[in-house]
Amino acid sequence: MARVLVVTTVYPSSPEINLDELVEKIKSKLPSDYEITRYDKVPIAFGLNALKLYVIIPEESEGGTSKLEEILQSVEGVEEIEVEAVHRISEY
């Protein structure tokens, strides 16, 4: 079964947000068939960092990335998200 890799940037609502804790909050909200395979902290400006998330989702996800986007937006501490890339991967 093919899966989809979604690369997103998550912008926190404040520079004081602990990004490691934010990732844990996000993981706790994701369905069991969604998986964060990697995340990086990306400097933005003036001490503000964003998270670059690499999330594997099922290819059959209805609505493409919209469900993932809704979940990410619902997490406390997330100001904005941006989907950067979507790739189909055959094996994972």
From Swiss-Prot:
It comes from the Archaea. Keywords: Elongation factor, Protein biosynthesis. InterPro entries: eEF-1beta-like_sf, EF1B_bsu/dsu_GNE, Transl_elong_EF1B/ribsomal_bS6, Transl_elong_EF1B_B_arc. Pfam families: EF1_GNE (PF00736). GO terms for molecular function: translation elongation factor activity. SMART domains: EF1_GNE (SM00888). Belongs to the EF-1-beta/EF-1-delta family. Promotes the exchange of GDP for GTP in EF-1-alpha/GDP, thus allowing the regeneration of EF-1-alpha/GTP that could then be used to form the ternary complex EF-1-alpha/GTP/AAtRNA. This is Elongation factor 1-beta. The gene is ef1b.
